[in-house]
Design a protein with these regions (language model features):
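A detector of single, family-specific signature residues
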Residues: 1-166
Length: 166
């Protein structure tokens, strides 16, 4: 499966968490050359139906949400996203965070959008997936969270002390 996906796309898209078995069906829906049909990754995500859409009239938002597009490739990216719930990858962490923040449906759509953007970038630029880029972001997010906890504890009159390893 991995060798066939590499042959079709020119890059190993099965490295993206969640896209293991879905790489070939996605190829059958979107094809090899994404750049001529979709100038940007946002155009690709919009075609998949993974982008929010705001209907405005007179400056007032009448409706906000994801457009109802029945796109099989978009459904496959959603399936890939929903399979990450128990995955211990950065994308799995992102899914759990978004589900807690936005709700299950919107969290899956947000993660599917992120997977689609990564997929588009890998295929059009012919670069390999590098999960180490996520490590710095996660470390930064944890550091900010720790600072926030310390600030809240200080405001309540407490002091946080890190545990010493045994």
């Amino acid at each position: 499966m991995r060798a066939e996906a590499y042959r079709l796309f020119g890059v190993d898209v099965t490295e993206i968490p969640g896209l293991n078995e879905l790489a070939i069906p996605i190829f059958s829906e979107v094809g090899r050359d994404l750049a001529p049909r979709f100038p940007t990754a946002d155009n690709f995500a919009s075609w998949l139906g993974l982008c929010p859409d705001n209907d405005k009239s007179g400056g007032q938002v009448l409706w906000a949400g994801v457009r109802r597009i029945h796109n099989r490739a978009g459904q496959m990216f959603r399936m890939a996203a929903s399979s990450l719930h128990h995955n211990r990858s950065p994308l799995g962490d992102f899914l759990r965070r978004m589900k807690a923040k936005l709700g299950p449906a919107a969290g899956i759509t947000a993660t599917a959008h992120k997977i689609a953007i990564i997929f588009y970038t890998l295929v059009t630029n012919q670069i390999e997936y590098d999960s180490s880029r996520w490590a710095a972001r996660d470390e930064h997010r944890h550091k900010r969270f720790e600072q926030k906890l310390k600030r809240q504890a200080r405001q309540l009159g407490y002091e946080l002390v890190p545990l010493q390893p045994i």
